[in-house]
Amino acid sequence: MSMNGRFKDNIRPERSGTITSLEKLVLHISGMRMTEEYEITVEGGAAAVSYYVFRCVENGFERALEKRVELGADEVVEKLNSFGLLSWNGFRGDHPRGVRDGIMFRLEAVVDGGAVIRADGSENFPKHFKELTFWLRGVLN
């Protein structure tokens, strides 16, 4: 899910800190029978929050836009900071032993003029992951 080769290497933040701007965020969530993706893209002072589902088609899967809303970019950055997004960089949540099924996620965010935050996991999530997904679902409904 690389966004573009022009961005800087991963940032290695302290456990605390904030981002000052967002260019793009993609959160990919999948499970046994579902795959969905949330995408936030910022242009100027507006942030487009989009929700996609992946549908089975004849030759694989199709990414289909279900809903899109616009929010203020500053509001989105403030919310992402409340979830401690910067501290997610480098998170790798390996699948817990003995768990046979679960939800997997992959996140990539381009922030602060080109720095990239990456995180992924399988039934193992960074702090405030649930709050982020609840917030995304809430703004889209």
Region locations from a protein language model:
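Short, flexible N-terminal segments of the mature chain
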Residues: 38-58
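Conserved long hydrophobic alpha-helices within structured protein cores
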Residues: 43-46, 75-85
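Short, well-ordered, aromatic-rich surface patches in folded extracellular/luminal domains
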Residues: 2-37, 65-70, 82-141
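Acidic, aromatic-enriched beta-alpha/helix-loop junctions
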Residues: 53-81
